Amino acid sequence: MVXWTDXERAAITSLWGKIDVGEIGPQALARLLIVYPWTQRHFSTFGNLSTNAAILGNPKVAAHGKTVMGGLELAVKNMDNIKGAYANLSKMHSEKIHVDPDNFRLLAEITTICLAAKFGPSVFTPDFQEAWQKFENAVVSALGRQYH
């Protein structure tokens, strides 16, 4: 279990309230597929992923990015039991989809980059980033739990 300070909880909740999952999610997933092209193997049913432009314009990438980002709400609402909240997702990604657990870390890093670019230093301050990184690390750990 992660021990959260009141300031960290407030930062994560505040930042989450500002996030448009329909904007950040597709952006983050598209960047993942472009920057780390080996991750595309999990998305063979998404159609054309042959170029950066194809990935950025792919409606299935956008829809799944929104779903993935929206899934973080589960962690925001269950900050005291993220591992329990993500148990089924972890099992699915481990046993059914066979996602390399390092991909969760890569997506978390890219999500942080997207948030920093979107909100800038006046909102995404070092304190907010510190809390967000701690939150993302907890999510990554929870998603990778079934791999151990």
Curated annotation (Swiss-Prot):
Purpose of the protein: Involved in oxygen transport from gills to the various peripheral tissues.
GO biological process, one term: hydrogen peroxide catabolic process
Similarity comment text for this entry: Belongs to the globin family.
Binding site for heme b: H64, H93
Keywords: Heme, Iron, Metal-binding, Oxygen transport, Transport
Coiled coil: none
PANTHER family from the UniProt entry: HEMOGLOBIN FAMILY MEMBER (PTHR11442), HEMOGLOBIN SUBUNIT BETA-1-RELATED (PTHR11442:SF102)
Name of the featured protein: Hemoglobin subunit beta
CDD domains: Hb-beta-like
Origin species: Decapterus maruadsi
GO CC terms in record: blood microparticle; haptoglobin-hemoglobin complex; hemoglobin complex
Residue span, Globin domain: 3-148
Gene: hbb
Disulfide bonds: none
Tissue distribution: Red blood cells.
Subunit composition and interactions: Heterotetramer of two alpha chains and two beta chains.
GO function term, MF aspect, one: peroxidase activity
PROSITE patterns listed in its UniProt record: GLOBIN
